[in-house]
Swiss-Prot record:
It comes from Caenorhabditis elegans. The lineage of its organism: Eukaryota, Metazoa, Ecdysozoa, Nematoda, Chromadorea. In the N-terminal section; belongs to the non-receptor class of the protein-tyrosine phosphatase family. This is mRNA-capping enzyme. InterPro entries: Dual-sp_phosphatase_cat-dom, mRNA_cap_enz_bifunc, mRNA_cap_enzyme_adenylation, mRNA_cap_enzyme_C, mRNA_Capping_Enz/RNA_Phosphat, NA-bd_OB-fold, Prot-tyrosine_phosphatase-like, Tyr_Pase_AS. Bifunctional mRNA-capping enzyme exhibiting RNA 5'-triphosphate monophosphatase activity in the N-terminal part and mRNA guanylyltransferase activity in the C-terminal part. Catalyzes the first two steps of cap formation: by removing the gamma-phosphate from the 5'-triphosphate end of nascent mRNA to yield a diphosphate end, and by transferring the GMP moiety of GTP to the 5'-diphosphate terminus via a covalent enzyme-GMP reaction intermediate. Residues 241-585 are annotated as: GTase. Residues 44-196 form the Tyrosine-protein phosphatase domain. Residues 213-243, 603-623 are annotated as: Disordered. The active site is at residues 136, 311. RNA triphosphatase activity is inhibited by magnesium. Residues 213-229 have a biased composition (Polar residues).
Length: 623
């Protein structure tokens, strides 16, 4: 029986091909993964002339790119055991897991990927503060494929964003086009604008001089030919979605004078700019993403002070304002250029380096006795103001900045004639938030009639939280049970069963499943939405049991469906709904809890003050 692990004879087979100058490690990915090439035990040291190229397992655990975090799970994807002893891993109180994969241009199978994801999920649930170390021979293609698949399926990244995230943290990332093509074929087969692999790295071109050419299983390679590159020198390792798609319209074309940015260089620059302004280290749309309010998280309302606002049935855009130029970024990170919209400072100069979060709506207003459409931008949060980062300020301060530094300055400029209403492409207002006590009033007819557009829910915003990019579990969105919905990718197929008439079925897909999340009957109306993103609600019976999915509308502002976790959370709100009555009753309960907590806090402060004031008197009496 062959000896497991390295032996002198196995070490004499030589270093892995092209290993010597391959970068040792990447950096932390999503605060969870740490990619690296396979380390080698000390039996290989005599084959490495310069000590700086030696790479032992112990070096991984102490690497500065871990920023003090500990690796708790080590996943070895190589197809051999000759490189190091597993005890060199387990002696660091780390779980070692071997997942043999062929490599050499062969992507991980669906089963391999599912096993990897399950393993990481179970570990991360048990040890949320530990890191997962992953390596194949070089730590690029197999490693990148599996990490990107995990980010896509579990963390709900877009596929291009998942691949890009790995590229940013592992020296341009996956460099073999076959692996990228396989990712798209498996997870996003409808995407035409696929990412191109970066140019093959210099170290990959090198052949090991004086060493036998090896592959993972320790046998000599049958070919020493270096594959040709695709000629693409994509420095970022990914392409942002939306490039070249000129059919997309701002607000579905309801507002004239706004055009999509067709200059790809300018678009990429602007996308990188707002990503930097937000300190956002991922790909795609950098805005804060609220979560659905459910019976499972409604207790957050009693844990800290919240403000409440209505949820407008408009479209969300991040707006970048700089020196007279105004750009809008939708949830697909598409860039639009807005003309004839001015933002000024107190002295009338153009506002600089400002980034705000908005909803754009079409209000119904009465002008000279006739009802007219009034485009309006509602600013509800701010990340940058005049080059100053305000993301770490509490929400109530950011809310005040919107009024005093943006809305009031525009109002003053209109009064002095510096700005003219007739020259503005749309109206701009601050979207109001109210103390939590006002929740019930937002359901009242007086408020609903006052708002000139459709309301489709409420937003609950903590007063003292900073602005967070990406998913924020503290910011809650509530919709009436009848309005709760999931965004699906629709696939319409014709099914023919023997002895029966053909039937058209709509299959509803979310990002994280190769199997449909649900189905619905494909009517003639529905067929035209094949391969498009549609919004659906779930009809339930009077006992809360699911009946069927119902089509609501096409989501022209989105190019990807919801992720699995989001879809499951929304379904929970449909099956166990938070009704208007339940919400108002719970808000009143939360207010009572907060009031008691505030009273207890004041009582504690008074008590501490009395103790402090009594100390000098007690000392005098003792003397």
């Amino acid at each position: 029986m062959a000896t497991r692990g390295p032996t002198p004879d196995k070490a004499r087979m030589g270093l892995p091909d092209r290993w010597l100058h391959c970068p040792k490690t990447g950096t932390l990915i999503n605060n969870l993964f740490f990619p690296f090439k396979t380390p080698l035990c000390k039996m290989y040291d005599n084959q490495i002339a310069e000590r700086r190229y030696q790479f032992h397992p112990a070096e991984v655990f102490s690497h500065p790119h871990l920023h003090g975090k500990k690796i708790g799970l080590w996943i070895d994807l190589t197809n051999t055991d000759r490189y190091y002893f597993r005890e060199e891993v387990t002696e660091h109180e780390c779980i070692y897991h071997k997942m043999k994969m062929a490599g050499r241009g062969v992507s991980p199978t669906q089963e391999d990927t599912d096993n990897f994801i399950k393993l990481v999920q179970e570990f991360h649930k048990k040890y949320p503060d530990r890191v997962v170390g992953v390596h194949c021979t070089h730590g690029f293609n197999r490693t990148g494929f599996l990490i990107a698949a995990y980010l896509f399926q579990v963390e709900e990244y877009g596929l291009d964003a998942a691949i890009g995230e790995f590229a940013e943290n592992r020296q341009k990332g996956i460099y073999k086009q076959d692996y990228i093509d396989d990712l798209f074929a498996r997870y996003d087969p409808t995407e035409d604008d696929k990412i191109l692999a970066p140019e093959k790295p210099d170290w990959e071109r090198e052949m090991s001089i004086g060493m036998s050419t090896q592959i993972d299983n320790g046998r000599p390679s049958t070919s020493q030919q270096i594959p040709a590159t695709n000629g693409n020198n994509n420095q970022n390792g990914n392409q942002l979605s939306g490039g070249g798609d000129n059919s997309k319209l701002f607000m579905d074309g309801l507002i004239r004078g706004v055009k999509v940015c067709e200059d790809e260089g300018k678009k990429s620059m602007l996308q990188a700019k707002i990503k930097n302004l937000c300190k956002y280290n991922k790909q795609g749309f950098p805005g804060l993403q609220p979560v659905s309010l459910s019976r499972g998280n409604i207790n957050l309302l009693e844990q800290e002070s919240y403000m409440v606002s209505w949820k407008a049935d408009g479209m969300r855009y991040i707006i970048y304002i700089n020196d007279g130029d105004v750009y809008a970024f939708d949830r697909d990170n598409e860039v639009f250029e807005i003309e004839n919209l001015d933002f000024v400072t107190k002295n009338g100069a153009p506002l600089m380096e400002t980034l705000v979060d908005t909803e754009v709506i079409i209000d119904k207003v009465e002008i000279n006795g006739a009802m007219c459409d009034q485009p309006r931008m509602l600013i509800y949060d701010i990340m940058r103001f005049n080059s100053v980062n305000v993301m770490k300020e509490p929400f109530y301060k950011r809310f005040e900045i919107i009024k005093t530094e943006i809305i009031d300055m525009r109002t003053a400029a209109f009064k002095t004639g510096r700005l003219k209403h007739e020259n503005q492409i749309m109206s701009v207002r601050r979207k109001d938030f109210y103390d939590l006590e006002a929740t019930a009033k937002l359901f009242g007819p007086k408020f609903v009639q006052h708002v000139g557009h459709e309301i489709d829910g409420l937003i609950f915003q903590p007063k003292k939280t900073k602005y967070e990019t990406g998913r924020c579990d503290k910011v809650l969105k509530w919709k009436p049970p009848s309005h709760n919905s999931v965004d699906f990718l629709l696939k319409v197929e014709k099914k023919c069963k023997e002895g029966m008439l053909p039937e058209w079925i709509g299959y509803l897909f979310v990002q994280n499943l190769s199997d449909p999340f649900g189905t619905m009957k494909a009517t003639a109306t529905l067929k035209k939405y094949h391969n498009k993103i549609i919004e659906c609600t779930l009809l339930v019976d009077n006992q809360g049991r699911p009946k069927e999915w119902k089509f609501m509308r096409e989501r022209t502002d989105k190019s990807l469906p919801n992720g699995l976790r989001t879809a499951e959370n929304v379904v929970e709100t449909m099956v166990n709904p938070v009704t208007e009555t339940y919400l108002i009753e719970y808000v009143n309960h939360a207010l009572r809890v907060l009031k008691r907590a505030a009273a207890a806090h004041r009582h504690h402060q008074i008590h501490q003050q009395q103790l402090h004031e009594g100390e000098p008197e007690a000392r005098r009496q003792k003397l």
